[in-house]
């Protein structure tokens, strides 16, 4: 059975799921980025694995649960025929971790690494099939498997090149 993440909120959850939500985004300065790079290299993990571990740990503490499920999106262009096609090819992956307070941080980090590698191996398995195969009772006010999604956009640059043209992101 998939655990439900009940976070303390200032309002009652509606009976039917809405798409109202919020997004939190941030940008790291160069010094923090370099520290993170050293850390992930030392522990032989990716930035995503680090942030998934952090998010799961924070959610675990806020919800006072030792079993947390978080969703993420993975590019779904595994087949050569999709490389030249326009459009978004993505699949939702589900991560379940147990960041208990008595567990050593590096142990949990390694668990998330193993979980991530396993998820990548099965990334072609459609999310809808997973939901159907688990065949759980479904609460109409929630996503069937998770309430929080982590998306890491690891953009090192603020511009892209298209042939002889250059597109630059301008912050306003």
What does each model-identified segment do?
Residues 8-14, 21-172:
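Adenylate-forming
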């Amino acid at each position: 059975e998939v655990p439900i993440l009940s976070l303390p909120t200032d309002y009652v959850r509606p009976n039917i799921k809405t798409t109202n939500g919020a997004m939190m985004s941030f940008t790291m300065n160069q010094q923090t980025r370099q520290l993170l790079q050293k850390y992930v290299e030392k522990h032989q993990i990716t930035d995503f694995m680090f942030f998934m571990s952090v998010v799961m740990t924070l959610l675990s503490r806020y919800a006072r649960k030792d079993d947390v499920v978080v969703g993420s999106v993975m590019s779904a262009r595994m087949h050569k025929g999709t490389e030249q096609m326009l459009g978004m090819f993505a699949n939702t992956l589900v991560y379940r971790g147990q960041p208990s307070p008595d567990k050593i941080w590096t142990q949990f980090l390694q668990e998330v690494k193993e979980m991530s590698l396993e998820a990548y191996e099965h990334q072609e398995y459609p999310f809808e099939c997973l939901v159907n195969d688990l065949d759980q009772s479904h609460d109409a006010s929630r996503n069937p498997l998770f309430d929080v999604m982590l998306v890491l956009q690891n953009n090192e640059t603020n511009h892209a090149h298209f042939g002889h043209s250059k597109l630059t992101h301008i912050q306003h």
